Amino acid sequence: MMRAVWEALAALAAVACLVGAVRGGPGLSMFAGQAAQPDPCSDENGHPRRCIPDFVNAAFGKDVRVSSTCGRPPARYCVVSERGEERLRSCHLCNASDPKKAHPPAFLTDLNNPHNLTCWQSENYLQFPHNVTLTLSLGKKFEVTYVSLQFCSPRPESMAIYKSMDYGRTWVPFQFYSTQCRKMYNRPHRAPITKQNEQEAVCTDSHTDMRPLSGGLIAFSTLDGRPSAHDFDNSPVLQDWVTATDIRVAFSRLHTFGDENEDDSELARDSYFYAVSDLQVGGRCKCNGHAARCVRDRDDSLVCDCRHNTAGPECDRCKPFHYDRPWQRATAREANECVACNCNLHARRCRFNMELYKLSGRKSGGVCLNCRHNTAGRHCHYCKEGYYRDMGKPITHRKACKACDCHPVGAAGKTCNQTTGQCPCKDGVTGITCNRCAKGYQQSRSPIAPCIKIPVAPPTTAASSVEEPEDCDSYCKASKGKLKINMKKYCKKDYAVQIHILKADKAGDWWKFTVNIISVYKQGTSRIRRGDQSLWIRSRDIACKCPKIKPLKKYLLLGNAEDSPDQSGIVADKSSLVIQWRDTWARRLRKFQQREKKGKCKKA
């Protein structure tokens, strides 16, 4: 009898140790209490800090699903007591239809009054290999500190505690109790717990004695003996280990006196059953340090009241638009709050990029999506193409970017300088939007060269007045009538340009023409640019009108690359093709240009 008393005291001491650990014992830092504060998730300066929900008995008042309950149909059961060496049995009736004689599962999680014990009770003699299970759904993820059961019957000889992290879809062992660990659960007896296996269930024979015959306690501490418990904040393994959505207790084997097979075995078997007065699951609503309480949502589901810009049932992700750094669990040192993306008020959505986060020294990884108000960039921090910054407004202003409004004819593109708004103008065009001709230029009818240089009067010794030599017929044949331009002629020449003859000067055996190159349709190896340039033609070619050129006229010139006298400009000779320009040729020459890029000239 004294032994039973001492065991009961030891069991109560174990529960007291658990409660003491919950209140601040070493290795259970995640369950440390906090002093009352106006806002437990912020310090006195308003800075975020870790906050955790209150410690509760998560089983209290919840329904427990059991695989066996006495009373359907009504059945006799006998309670064994001992007086010295004598065993006494007092028999009663379990009747589920009579509230005074029923032992329903609700008694497992009701208010436990030691002066008026209420006990759930199984059917009689459900012995191994049959088992009896108690399944408790917590309603959401909890970080469990302990699971305890107080018995009205003798404690089981073998029992297992399981947990689920996915609302009962899968189960993993939490703890085993048995005098025959290897036989019952294929586990070694009291295996040492190391850092390598601290997330695994162990089997022990503690709390498996048959006595006391009533009032015995089994209490399992989830972190007791786990090596990383002292550094719980930095141990994802143990954080996962204590997490559960459901708890299941499986009673595998009854303790007996060995009289179940004797002559009065029916009376003996009616004395063996499982009966529990109290099932407790001590722990906290799992909120990863980002909430101080759990509340019911619109669907009446239990969820964390998330802070620190977090979201989710367990505050296990960042809320929308707060992806500038990755989600992390809060610790005693760092709140690890989620940070909003910096989009300068021009975007409503963003995403996280780990590569950018690493490159920033782990400070910022947010990338803004769908920038509005004509902005662009990772942070919507510059103006998109076709717009420029209005420096009189902050970048966060809705009208911080102004349209370039580049002239459709005078500008060479739609993109302007991001700072000044200056559009890229074509040759001879000026103005911030390229809307007027520059000094010394006049407007033309060509959309390609809308501004051309104002012509200069030809010199007194004009190229057209040169006397024709007598041997021109044998030297070259001047073109007569209309010349046609085709792909074959285009491919044979090194360059093809549209020119405007401005003036001509005699330079020894050469004529130097100052021309304005309006368009370049082919340039070969020589880099020919639009604008003013020199055209060199030998005097004899000009005298024989090969080619025939007049000042102030526009021509299509197709020629071959040749060094000019001053190493600049282009050279034409009797083999060059010079045709007075027609605006209808522009489209044809652009087609030739495209075909050349596709390699058609090689086949021509």
UniProtKB/Swiss-Prot annotation:
Residues 1-24 form the signal peptide. GO terms for biological process: anterior/posterior axon guidance; apoptotic process; Cdc42 protein signal transduction; cell-cell adhesion; chemorepulsion of axon; glial cell proliferation; inner ear morphogenesis; mammary gland duct morphogenesis. A motif (Cell attachment site) lies at residues 530-532. One of its GO terms (cellular component) is actin cytoskeleton. The keyword Lipoprotein does not apply. Glycans are attached at residues 95, 116, 131, 417. SMART domains: C345C, EGF_Lam, LamNT. Disulfide bonds join 119-152, 285-294, 287-304, 306-315, 318-338, 341-350, 343-368, 371-380, 383-401, 404-416, 406-423, 425-434, 437-451, 472-544, 491-601. Pfam families: EGF_laminin, EGF_LMN_ATRN, Laminin_N, NTR. Residues 47-284 form the Laminin N-terminal domain. Changing residue 351 to H: In a neuroblastoma sample. Widely expressed in normal adult tissues with highest levels in heart, small intestine, colon, liver and prostate. Reduced expression in brain tumors and neuroblastomas. Expressed in epididymis (at protein level). Residues 285-340, 341-403, 404-453 form the Laminin EGF-like domain. InterPro entries: Galactose-bd-like_sf, Laminin/Netrin_ECM, Laminin_N, LE_dom, LMN_ATRN_NET-like_EGF, Netrin_domain, Netrin_module_non-TIMP, TIMP-like_OB-fold. It is found in: Secreted; Cytoplasm. Gene3D superfamilies: 2.40.50.120, Galactose-binding domain-like, Laminin. Keywords: Apoptosis, Cytoplasm, Disease variant, Disulfide bond, Glycoprotein, Laminin EGF-like domain, Repeat, Secreted, Signal. Binds to its receptors; DCC, UNC5A, UNC5B, UNC5C and probably UNC5D. Binds to its receptor; DSCAM. Interacts with DCC. Interacts with APP. Netrins control guidance of CNS commissural axons and peripheral motor axons. Its association with either DCC or some UNC5 receptors will lead to axon attraction or repulsion, respectively. Binding to UNC5C might cause dissociation of UNC5C from polymerized TUBB3 in microtubules and thereby lead to increased microtubule dynamics and axon repulsion. Involved in dorsal root ganglion axon projection towards the spinal cord. It also serves as a survival factor via its association with its receptors which prevent the initiation of apoptosis. Involved in tumorigenesis by regulating apoptosis. This is Netrin-1. It comes from Homo sapiens.
